[in-house]
């Protein structure tokens, strides 16, 4: 299982508790507002908004919450204005980090991110010093038990996917960001609900971490993801599943 897939799978198990605490709802509401402000409130003409609305529904966000968040983005309702800011850095063991945030106070967020990186053995890096190590891709994960390989491959490739990768118990479907929505709709058209579906920053190469650096990295990524301004955290760290689970316990 790839480093990205391992982290996502284990965090997904932990995600039920996060949802109860409202953390997932808070992030999605911010994303809905920003997407609507950037591209309008119509999901038929705003693919980014359509993807986030689908995610909101997948975690059972009430329709009224979704509607109000979109209306705050379009200006139909008053609300806080959020800014998208991406930070780059290094964690323990030299693993690279990309931290995507949505914030209403840039100075507060940059200070807190710098503090967290330093506290857990990392440091902030200059802009574009880390981003080049990653490729921005559409990323969909499908449980092998839920699908026929030939049918999935045919549907995904016909919809514009670049690759179908064998990842142990699952298939990873990779596409360009522009093709992502069409590929996702093709997968769902087979009656499959993906285990993950997102625009992801996928590492070109991984950095293997073990022992203390691995434990520190897991704790750092976990606390960064739990930060109220955090949207997504990406890393090229490759850590064994048992070490991730033990560090998150």
Residue ranges and their predicted role:
Residues 1-125, 130-139, 208, 248-249:
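N-terminal cationic and glycine-rich segments that engage phosphates or anionic surfaces
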Residues 139-249:
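Positively charged, low-complexity, intrinsically disordered RNA-binding extensions
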């Amino acid at each position: 299982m790839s480093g990205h897939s391992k982290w996502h799978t284990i965090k997904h198990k932990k995600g039920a508790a996060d949802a109860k605490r409202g953390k997932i709802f808070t992030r999605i509401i911010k994303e809905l507002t920003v997407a609507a402000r950037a591209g309008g409130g119509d999901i038929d003409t705003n693919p980014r908004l359509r993807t986030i609305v689908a995610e909101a529904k997948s975690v059972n966000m009430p329709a009224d919450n979704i509607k109000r968040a979109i209306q705050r983005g379009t200006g139909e309702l008053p609300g806080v204005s959020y800014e998208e800011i991406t930070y780059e850095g290094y964690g323990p063991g030299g693993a690279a980090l990309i931290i995507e945030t949505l914030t209403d106070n840039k100075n507060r967020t940059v200070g807190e991110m710098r503090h967290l990186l330093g506290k857990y053995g990392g440091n902030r890096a200059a802009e574009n010093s880390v981003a080049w190590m990653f490729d921005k891709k559409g990323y969909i994960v499908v449980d092998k038990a839920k699908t026929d390989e030939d049918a999935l491959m045919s549907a995904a490739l016909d919809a514009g996917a670049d690759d179908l990768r064998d990842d142990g118990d699952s298939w990873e479907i990779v596409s360009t960001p522009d093709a992502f929505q069409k590929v996702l709709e093709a997968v769902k058209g087979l009656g499959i609900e993906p285990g993950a579906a997102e625009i992801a920053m996928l590492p070109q190469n991984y950095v293997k971490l073990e022992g203390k650096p691995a434990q520190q990295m897991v704790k750092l990524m976990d606390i960064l993801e739990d930060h109220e301004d955090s949207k997504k955290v990406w890393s090229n760290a490759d850590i064994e599943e048992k070490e991730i689970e033990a560090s998150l316990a």
